[in-house]
Amino acid sequence: MAHKKGVGSSKNGRESASKRLGVKIFGGQACKAGNIIVRQRGTEFHPGENIGMGRDHTLFALVDGTVCFKVGRNDRRSVSVVPAVEA
């Protein structure tokens, strides 16, 4: 016989909601100024040219163009936006 009752809902429900982090616009894709490119905790990706960084380390585009990911010295990954050529 069980000496404790099967404890159900009162012991459940401690999991936090997912934060939806990660790359939102990938390399080679077009983006507009203000679009979020990467949501991250800390600087997993560093801001390159035409990229702004929010206070939660979110990277966003400052100009319209194409997203470009680069690997620099010491495997430091950065994100840039190559401006779109206006015709």
From Swiss-Prot:
GO terms for biological process: translation. The keyword Iron-sulfur does not apply. GO terms for molecular function: structural constituent of ribosome. The keyword Ribonucleoprotein applies. It comes from the Bacteria. It holds the Pfam family Ribosomal_L27. Keywords: Ribonucleoprotein, Ribosomal protein. GO terms for cellular component: cytosolic large ribosomal subunit. Belongs to the bacterial ribosomal protein bL27 family. PANTHER family: LARGE RIBOSOMAL SUBUNIT PROTEIN BL27M, RIBOSOMAL PROTEIN L27. This is Large ribosomal subunit protein bL27. It comes from Phocaeicola vulgatus (strain ATCC 8482 / DSM 1447 / JCM 5826 / CCUG 4940 / NBRC 14291 / NCTC 11154).
